Every structure is written in structure tokens, then in C-alpha cells.
Amino acid sequence: MGRRWGSPALQRFPVLVLLLLLQVCGRRCDEAAPCQPGFAAETFSFSVPQDSVAAGRELGRVSFAACSGRPWAVYVPTDTRFKVNGDGVVSTKRPLTLYGRKISFTIYAQDAMGKRHSARVTVGRHRHRRHHHNHHLQDTTPAVLTFPKHDPGFLRRQKRDWVIPPISCLENHRGPYPMRLVQIKSNKDKESKVYYSITGQGADSPPVGIFIIERETGWLEVTEQLDREKIDRYTLLSHAVSASGQPVEDPMEIIITVMDQNDNKPVFIKEVFVGYIEENAKPGTSVMTVNATDADDAVNTDNGIVSYSIVSQQPPRPHPQMFTIDPAKGIISVLGTGLDRETTPNYTLIVQATDQEGKGLSNTATAIIEVTDANDNIPIFNPTMYEGVVEENKPGTEVARLTVTDQDAPGSPAWQAVYHIKSGNLDGAFSIITDPSTNNGILKTAKGLDYETKSRYDLVVTVENKVPLSVPITLSTASVLVTVLDVNEPPVFVPPIKRVGVPEDLPVGQQVTSYTAQDPDRDMRQKITYRMGSDPAGWLYIHPENGIVTATQPLDRESVHAINSTYKAIILAVDNGIPDTTGTGTLLLLLQDVNDNGPTPEPRSFEICSRQPEKQILSIVDKDLPPHTYPFKAALEHGSSNNWTVEIRGQDELAMGLKKELEPGEYNIFVKLTDSQGKAQVTQVKAQVCECEGTAKNCERRSYIVGGLGVPAILGILGGILALLILLLLLLLFARRRKVEKEPLLPPEDDMRDNVYNYDEEGGGEEDQDYDLSQLHRGLDARPEVIRNDVAPPLMAAPQYRPRPANPDEIGNFIDENLKAADTDPTAPPYDSLLVFDYEGGGSEATSLSSLNSSASDQDQDYDYLNEWGNRFKKLAELYGGGEDDE
């Protein structure tokens, strides 16, 4: 047995077991090690390259273990100018200036048990500056970046504390390319084959291919020159996978910072800057600000920090350094005294901007400074005495123009004049303004002047500039004499608006009031006459001499011309000046109400059902005013109460209803309403009775029926009217059927005597045989308006008669043609119904027709022409034409 234990195999076995137990115990002890909450350090220091720190600038990171199982914590800084993210990154909340000093503050955080921990943070400027011209920072970049370990006992703590330092790469590096930056390695590369790759901007995202990684070795390389002004920072993710493509590490973030090189010179925002400064300005007065920008880094380096300086000044008088410039801000200000616009109106400066705080690249621009005029010369009146004449009652009239001279620059505020009336301007009667083109003062009347009140004004005017004088000097003054001219002014009513109370029942012709005007021109002693200018209703008359107003018609408060019981009339007053003028006054008659209107119902028609009707409510309207209105009384007139009822409801309502059922139709109801003073009014209201029950809807209109009469009475009235019409018709027919006895056209044959019978005396004798035939009338032809009523109207066309000729020689043809037309007229009666004769003189002394012949016998008389005169002269032709045959 001793040999067994003494064998080498048995001797090594306990040692192996012991080592295994120690390893297991060590791991268990490590796993069971408790988490220690708190900050990784008591103090943290962060540095910045310059005093000015921009808002949002990340300063660094603090490390804190909360032992809560979360990879983040809540941090509270005591300085509100800073903030701390959940991952411990400290940054500025707003722009910050250090002024060469350090800022310290405390950060608090709580662990999982609620215990409060603190750490001190200090922020200061890093004095050692590097300009980064051509050297690079490869030696500051770690040669190898290893993926974080993932051991179970340290996974959580290592993930929280692992900070990958940024990789720096200088822009514009000459290479050679590709150039290695850093090597990425995984702890698993000893266990199995690991392949590396990168993703992100510059790798597989635009710009693609700037960064590459060797697949097997993990070397990260840059393939071309970088430009910080385009992209100053690249963020990549590195990946490690096995030969089968399975990830062996979590992706690791890699930040590549492009370091600045001073490859950009400052650029002014303008090539020429223009500024203005007043002459005699004191040293230190700001003139203008020039500004230049630099694309290089001004945060971590001095490459973008610009410094300003003045290279030259033209002209160099009164000395070559009249201005200075702030190197940091570019503010140009006055350095010396003696600026004079009259000698040197402007200066030209060459301004230079240099980066690296004045030690690097530079650029220039031009600054032109205009010296403006200062108010060192007062305006002076030339001349100092003025006179003006203006008519009264003309506001805005120019009185005079005041001229001044000023030695300052024309158009400048130091030259522009401002005028003031110092004295004599009673009640603000005048105003003065400045002519902007000539700088003269224009004196005007601010309101109408009154000659009778004041006929002369003595004004004192002063002048100054818009800007105050640079030195105390007495102001220049001028005197203005203004004379007011008298003009004929219109009469003025006193008061201009007169209110008069008058009852509306004022008798016609009675005086309403007296409304007179006064003439402002007392010295002219003019006569004033009055007349109505506006009298819409024509109610008034004004006496032209004394202005007494009387009523020409009854006044009516309820008229449309009386608004709110007020009647407005315009009265005119005219003087007899040359030219005459007219004044206007307003007369307001406050009409006092009288009880002249009876109450009436509204509306004056309604519809109602014949069965079980609802009462109709009408409004009572009284145009008068209280107490000439309610309470009202209502009654029915002219028999309307037989069928209808009426009653007063409330203050001004009238309820109407049916007393009994009526036939459908339209009825007239006579309603009498009486007001509280006994004024009554009977009004006819139309009611449409409908064949319905209850409320009347879509009422069909029937025949018109008087409110107090029934159907039998109406039928009786209509029957009487019809009988009267029949009687009148019978009388007319009887009158037309009476026979008219006609007298014979000619006397019987046995009634013939020696002389012509039944001829009217036509007058005239031998002395009347010579007369003008043109003076004869043409009977009915000359009287076309005369209508024949002894025959029936013809059914055929009437004959055409020839008009009387103008030549007397054609009178024979005229008579023959018209006789023939009359004989052939079928509508002519056997005798003329109307003969019109001209007066031919006195009565004839001849006792018989035989005396017409001068010879003793009628043998030389030829009566044959009587046979040619037609049927009307046939009997006469037989009497005188047949004598020879008888013998």
C-alpha cells in the first residue's frame, strides 16, 4: 500500500485537486465580492483650451457606482451652469467665460440604498497650447483597442466604467495612405479565429471608404486626407465575428476626431465697412464694428481666434492715429481729438484680421469713416422784421415766410430749423412749420381770426435746430406784425340751436317762438332778413323782419317728420352786405302730446274657426303718450255684437271671439276702443271664419259678409238691386221703340203756287251778286266733325268730295263734281239735314223772283241749265224750263 501512495501519479493527484479547489473557491469569492457604491474618485479635473466655452460643450465624464443594477444614475450639480447626463458626461448648459480662473462645484448622486455621495469637479483653462501645423498626434493615440471583457463577475461593472478614448487624426496629413490609426483586438482571438469589420460614417455610409479595417489583423486605417472644415468627427462601430459569422463581441464605438490645421485665413463679412462719427467727438466714442470669420477651430486651438488691428489711416491728419480698434471685438473708436468736418470730412482705414491671436494668417478690409456735422452754428433770421395781412375767419392761411441761414451742412439735423412763437400768439391763433426743402418758416393762421375782437397781432418767433447746440449760444429771434382785414361775416343765431316746447294742437297762425340772429359786423350796420331754410312738413312761417315763427298748419307729434317728438327746422338769416352772407340756426320744436289719436287694434284682420274657436288676441295701438293711453275700453258697434265678443286683456291687448257659430266667410267687425281720457276710435276689423274647429289653419276664404247682417238680409238687398236694374232696362227699351214721324220731303202737287214755296229767306239782293266765292263754306265738307243722326250709319264707303280749289276759275268744275258725288251717294237722305250759309247782307227788296231779271219779259232767260242740276232741282226746271213748250 505504501508503494501505491508513493507512486508519482498518486503523489500528483492531491496537488491537482487542491489547485482545482483553490481556483473554484477563488472564482466563487470573486463572484460573491460585494458592490462598493460611490464615485470612482473624490475629485475630477477638466480643462478647456480657452476662457470662452460654448454652450453644450462636453468637458469630461465622472464615474459612479450606484449598485442598483442600472448602467446610469441621477446626478445633481451645485452649479446650474453645468449639467451631468445619466452616463456621467459633464457639459455646459450655456456659454461660459473663465476669465483666467478655475470653476469648482460639487456633484451629488444616490446609490441603490438612497445614500448620498459627492465628488468635486474643477474646470480650468489648459495653458499649454499646441498649434498643430504639420506634426500629428499619433503618439497620443493608443496603439491597440481591446473589446471590453465579458466575464460574468465583472460584466456589469466593466460596461459601466469602460470609456473608449477618442482617436485623433490631423487634417491634411501627407500620408502615405492608407495610414494606420489603431488596431482593434478581441480577447477571443486566442480561442478561435476572429474577423473584424467597421460600420458608420466614413466606412459604409457617405463618405464611403475613408476608413477601412484589415479583416484579420484589426488595423483601422484612413485612406485619404481629411478636412476638418467639412467633417470634424467620425463615429464608427467595430465588429468582431467568428469564422462562422457569429458575433464574439458586442459592437464597440470608435470616435475619430479630426485635428485642426491652420489652413484657412480670416474672411471679413464685407469688403468695405462704412461708419459715421460726429465732429468734435470725444476719445473713446465708438464709430463702428468690423467683423471677420475663420473656418478653423477656435475652441481647441488658436487657429480660429481672430485678432484685429489698423494698418493705415488716410488722411493722416490732424495726426496719424485718430482711431483705434479692439483686437478681440473689432470695435473702432475715436482715439484722438480734433475731428473737424470742415477740414476732413472722411477717413479711410485699412483694417487687418489675423488668426492664432495675431500670429497666423491674415486678411484686410477697408473701413470708411464719415465725419458728420455737429450743431456748432445756430440758424439766424435774415431779415428779422416781417409783416403780413390776412382776412378774418380764414384758418390755414399763410401769413408770412421767415428765412434763416445756417452754416451747418444742408439737410443734416444740425441744419434743419425748428420755429417757435415765443410771444403774441393769443389763444393759439397762429402756427409755424418748417419748409423741409428751403428750411424757411411758414407762418399760418391756426384758426379763424376775428377782426371785431382783435385786428392786429405782434408776434415774436425764435428758431433752433433739431439737435441741441454743442455750445451754449443765444437763439436768433424775429418780429412779425399781422394785420387782420374785416370781411362781411354771416349773421349768427343766438343760440345756434334753439329748443322750444310747444303743444301739438297749437292753433294755426299762433306764435311759436322768436328766433333772431346778430350781425358780427357791428360797424357795417347791415339789415338782417329771415326765411325758412328747411321745413320738411311745411308747418312754420318766419317773419322776414322780426324773426317771429308762427304755425301755418296744425302740428302733429305723431308725424313722420317729428322724430322722438322733436321737429327740426332750419332758419336762415341773410344780411344785405356786398356780397350778402347767410347764417344758419336750428330750431327744435319739442312737441307736447295731446290726446288727438284714438286707440286702434292691430292687426286688423284675423282667421278663426267656426266651431269651438280660440279667441284672437290683437294689440291695442295708441299713438299718443301716457296718460292719454291705457286703461282702454272696448265695445262693438253697428250690430257686430250679435255675432262677436270683445274684451280687454292686460294693458294693451284685445281678445275677440265668436258669440255663436257662423257660416264660413269674411265678416266685418266694428270695434270701438276708448282710451283713459275718453278718446274713442271705431275701427273695422276683418275676420275670416273658416270651416274648422279649434285653431284656424289653411283657412279657405268664402264670400264677404258684413259683421252684423245675416244671409236673408243680404239676399233681400241683392233682390231689390236686381229689380231696380230690370225696371231701368224696360224703360230704355220702351223709349227706343217709339215711332218717329217724318215730314214729307216736298209739299204735295196741289200746294204749288205762283212763287217758289217753302224756301227760307237767304237774304241779299242785286247789290250782293258780286262777292268772293272763296269765302263760301262748303257745308258738311267744311264741318267733318258734324255727325248726321237722321240716317243709319252707311255700310259702304262714303263718296270722295273734291276739296275747294285755290283758283277761282275752277269753281265751276268744283261744284259740278261735288254735285255728281252727292247725287250718287247712296247714304244721302232726300234732303240736306244741315246747311251752313255765309252772311250775304241785308234783306232783298224784291218781292218775287221775277224781279231778278232786268228785262221786262223773261223771254231772254234760259233756264235749261236747271235740268243739268240733278234731281234736287227737277221741280224748278219743270216750272221754268217748260214755258215755251206751253206757248
From Swiss-Prot:
Ca(2+) 3 binds at D294. This is Cadherin-1. The keyword Transport does not apply. PANTHER family: CADHERIN-1 (PTHR24027:SF319), CADHERIN-23 (PTHR24027). It is found in: Cell junction, Adherens junction; Cell membrane; Endosome; Golgi apparatus, trans-Golgi network. It comes from the Eukaryota. GO terms for biological process: adherens junction organization; calcium-dependent cell-cell adhesion via plasma membrane cell adhesion molecules; cell migration; cell morphogenesis; cell-cell adhesion mediated by cadherin; cell-cell junction assembly; homophilic cell adhesion via plasma membrane adhesion molecules; synapse assembly. The gene is CDH1.
